[in-house]
Amino acid sequence: VFMLFKSDFKEKNDYVNYLNKRCIENGFSGIVIIETHEDADNLGEDNGNIKFLREPATSLNLFRKSPRNIIFRLKNKIGKISRKISSGYIEINDGNKIYREAINYKNKKVIRGLCLEWDNTPRHGERGYIITPPTKEMFMEYMDSIKDTELLIINAWNEWCEGMILEPTEENKYKYLEWIKEWSEKNENRIDGV
């Protein structure tokens, strides 16, 4: 299994074919490619590769494009213009609204993602944005909405100071791990295939 973080490069097919050939030469049945995408409306060609919707980017893009959110887009546009004149505007997104977009997305042929919170302002300053954490109820609703999918990839890689935390903290204690445990225990029979 090989995951391509940015899968829209022109040499992709040649590269994947080469990797597949090498895998077969070394006794494997081939390679499985997972392509990472941020735009749920543009998953590219159906090339047999598995598509993964990276969060929070995918749901944030759905949220920003939704006609329901025109006021948010206008406010954000004004904020970006004012940022060029002075400083102080940072885009703050309601995690529950972002999760709602994720819940409403119904494509079952993709691997879904999960991100519990986001804040890349330490790295990007005013160019960054914040996504507030969802409520426990919204998290559970999202998990219920994707429970029939085979895989879930949790974005908790905090290498670039983007606030994607899953691990215990002084502020949240074990909250997110406890949410996952609670949901898993509630759905234990489905997960074990019983």
Language-model region placement:
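Generic structural signal for well-ordered alpha-helices
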Residues: 13-20, 99-102, 143-147, 177-181
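Carbohydrate-binding surfaces of carbohydrate-active enzymes
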Residues: 176-194
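The substrate-binding groove and active-site-proximal loops of carbohydrate-active enzymes
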Residues: 1-11, 83-93, 126-136, 162-171
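Short, well-ordered beta-to-alpha junction loops that form the rim of enzyme active sites
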Residues: 5-7, 37-38, 115, 155-158
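Extracellular zinc-dependent metalloprotease catalytic-domain scaffold
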Residues: 6-23, 185
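Substrate-binding cleft of secreted/luminal carbohydrate-active enzymes
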Residues: 132-168, 187-192
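Aromatic-lined glycan-binding groove of carbohydrate-active enzymes
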Residues: 18-132
